[in-house]
Swiss-Prot record:
GO terms for molecular function: structural constituent of ribosome. Transmembrane segments: none annotated. One of its GO terms (cellular component) is cytosolic large ribosomal subunit. Keywords: Ribonucleoprotein, Ribosomal protein. It comes from Cyanothece sp. (strain PCC 7425 / ATCC 29141). Pfam families: Ribosomal_L19 (PF01245). GO terms for biological process: translation. This is Large ribosomal subunit protein bL19. This protein is located at the 30S-50S ribosomal subunit interface and may play a role in the structure and function of the aminoacyl-tRNA binding site. PANTHER family: LARGE RIBOSOMAL SUBUNIT PROTEIN BL19M, RIBOSOMAL PROTEIN L19. Belongs to the bacterial ribosomal protein bL19 family.
Length: 120
């Protein structure tokens, strides 16, 4: 067993199996565990998935939302122990793999059409 096989087997143990099928354009609510003082709590972060990277344990999604008139993007490691839950709010109908063009849009132009042919 060489080093790469050992690393792959260790990573396979850490993969989460209960993740929903997330697509670019979906509106998701991510529950992130944050620590305040000596207490831990779950902070929800809701927004639209503008990018997705699939690479095993390093799979990430970039979620964008508008907070107090300012666009905020966060990158979440899907298999991180800090990500407690991911819930799909609605499915989006898009024709691009990356929605970086939404960064330049303002107001109603940032909306994505809803898709009804996929399960939530």
């Amino acid at each position: 067993m060489n080093a790469q096989e050992i690393i792959r087997s260790l990573e396979a143990e850490q993969l989460k199996s209960n993740l929903p099928e997330i697509h670019v354009g979906d509106t998701v609510k991510v529950g992130v565990i944050i620590q305040e003082g000596n207490k831990e709590r779950t902070q929800p972060y809701e927004g639209i998935v503008i990018a997705k990277r699939n690479s095993g344990i390093n799979a990430t999604i970039t979620v964008r939302r508008i907070f107090q008139g300012v666009g905020v993007e966060r990158v979440f490691l899907l298999h991180s122990p800090r990500v407690e839950s991911i819930k799909i709010i609605k499915r989006g109908k898009v024709r691009r793999a990356k929605l970086y063009y939404l960064r330049d849009r303002v107001g109603k132009a940032t909306r994505v059409k809803q898709r009804f042919d996929r399960e939530l």
